[in-house]
UniProtKB/Swiss-Prot annotation:
GO BP annotations listed: gluconeogenesis; glycolytic process
Main location: cytoplasm
Protein name according to UniProt: Phosphoglycerate kinase
Pathway given in the UniProt record: Carbohydrate degradation; glycolysis; pyruvate from D-glyceraldehyde 3-phosphate: step 2/5
InterPro entries registered for this protein in UniProt: Phosphoglycerate_kinase (IPR001576), Phosphoglycerate_kinase_N (IPR015824), Phosphoglycerate_kinase_sf (IPR036043)
Sequence positions that bind ATP: K208, G296, E327, G355, G356, D357, S358
Amino acid sequence: MAKKTIRDIELKNKSVLMRVDFNVPLNKDGSISDDTRITAALPTIEYAIEKGAKLILFSHLGRIKTAEDKATNSLKPVAARLSELIGRPVVFIPETRGEALEAAVKNLKSGDVLMFENTRFEDLDGNKESKNNPELGKYWASLGDVFVNDAFGTAHRAHASNVGIANNMEVSVAGLLLEKEINFIGGALENPERPFVAILGGAKVSDKIEVIKNLLKVADKVLIGGGMAFTFLKAQGFEVGKSLVELDKLDLAKELLELSKGKIELGFDVVTGKAFDKDTETNVRSFDAIPADEMGLDIGPKTVARFKEIIASAKTVVWNGPQGVFEMEKFANGTLEVTKALADLHGKAITIVGGGDSAAAVAKFGLEDKFSHISTGGGASLEYLEGKVLPGVELVDVI
């Protein structure tokens, strides 16, 4: 179902409310340690400016549980960074509502940019943002003529700053970043070019059950590494030593393996250590030879070779979750090799990284520009891959 985007509406002299995801990591001194989420929103912001919008930006930042949290989670440094990136002033209003904000909005001229304070400051008073307080959504909606949602990172949440505003606006459209997320992830699930390979990793099966079930319906192969692989191995009768296993998920793992009809591939071997430690002694063990006092912390060389062979022929790949403890050098090889294999598909296949740790791994290895799409939403991309309807996508008008 085609969604309306910012390109489909008139912006000149319109007050444009734009929900962005500027939930960036901050250093102790308040400076921004990674501005990826800001740069990801630039195409939409610059498009709106170019078309003569009066732009009103807002986002959440961190979690606000006490009044003290406000001091360390202000969007002020974000506004300053955005101003540097777009080369024009960004008026920052340190409020989430009130006369100062209303007056500043009224004073905006075509091409001006304003940002107001962290939407979650409203959570100090009865979680108004996170619980989608109807009055708050209505108030924010009253500040603008049209609503643009460009925050995929919060698309799986129904908050006042997305769904609440949309419920009170005649026009709600997707920004260019949200459009890209819908096109890439939605396209992979609905109409993938084949072979379609899904690569899953991370620690727990329980985090990815629905993703596995949904991907088994559409993918040609599902490669599973990381900690979650050991629950599947245990379910097949292998002894996995001290490796991470979810005992309460063994029956489910068996069920998924049967359901997969050979689509799930776990490989052949693992890299083990005696402890979860960067200095532990490592060994390569086949699945049937993992000692009781060792734990698997990365996929082994034969598994790497098998995964690379499958990836090489793929036309669509979705990757969510590292293959090992890539933060430790001794257990980074599996994730590195998978990243490189996907980078080698550049220009030959669609490669999608589902946010979170996988995106961090791609960044660590410096291969971001070799991927078709790196999702800006961890939880949102996971729920999208589960086949769920995301509130922040559903609110967008249909063409």
